[in-house]
Amino acid sequence: MIAFVSGPVAALAPTTAVIEVGGIGMAVQCTPHTLADLRVGREARLATSLVVREDSLTLYGFANDDERQVFELLQTASGVGPRLAQAMLATHSPDALRLAVSTGDEKALTAVSGIGKKGAQKLLLELKDRLGEPVGAHIGQQGIGTPVTSGWRDQLQAALIGLGYASREADEAVNAVAPQAEAAVAEGTAPPVPQLLRAALQTLNRAR
């Protein structure tokens, strides 16, 4: 198992960071939130989980060990693979997921792209005794999904700047996709940050 990778960031993409380790570039799949804290040329340390398939080896990266642990625990539920587990962490923090499961908050889970009503009900049953209670004292005050719902602009802008775009370009791209985010909030769901990032990049590519 590769527990973590540490080294300078060689490259950043919308879903991937390349970390140079001993002269080798390790491609690591990350959420937009994790990517937003990385900068090309700067040192980084990512907790990692290696997913082995017959035709691929995929390394998933996380800001800390807690995110990695939750990522791996989520996959113990039937129907949850690494991509869905990562999507859940892109939408909610580890503690927000723990709170959602411990309180039976079906709405919080359906805010994740790829999880419907029946899927959420099944996950609540299967994960109830696996994730445990929230470990952060602040979670009860901030509520489930609050960081993603209210902070999607900051996440998106930081991710775009991390990819090498100027602040002005990032601001314009964020404003361009704002209606999509606001529509999600109006429906009571968290803005889909990964999809918003892709849409923002498409906007920037068209402008060039």
From Swiss-Prot:
Keyword check for DNA damage: yes
Listed GO MF terms: ATP binding; four-way junction DNA binding; four-way junction helicase activity
Keywords: Cytoplasm, DNA damage, DNA recombination, DNA repair, DNA-binding
Region (Domain III): 148-208
UniProt-annotated stretches for the region Flexible linker: 143-147
Purpose: The RuvA-RuvB-RuvC complex processes Holliday junction (HJ) DNA during genetic recombination and DNA repair, while the RuvA-RuvB complex plays an important role in the rescue of blocked DNA replication forks via replication fork reversal (RFR). RuvA specifically binds to HJ cruciform DNA, conferring on it an open structure. The RuvB hexamer acts as an ATP-dependent pump, pulling dsDNA into and through the RuvAB complex. HJ branch migration allows RuvC to scan DNA until it finds its consensus sequence, where it cleaves and resolves the cruciform DNA.
Subunit structure, interactors included: Homotetramer. Forms an RuvA(8)-RuvB(12)-Holliday junction (HJ) complex. HJ DNA is sandwiched between 2 RuvA tetramers; dsDNA enters through RuvA and exits via RuvB. An RuvB hexamer assembles on each DNA strand where it exits the tetramer. Each RuvB hexamer is contacted by two RuvA subunits (via domain III) on 2 adjacent RuvB subunits; this complex drives branch migration. In the full resolvosome a probable DNA-RuvA(4)-RuvB(12)-RuvC(2) complex forms which resolves the HJ.
Entry similarity comment: Belongs to the RuvA family.
Protein name as catalogued: Holliday junction branch migration complex subunit RuvA
This protein's encoding gene: ruvA
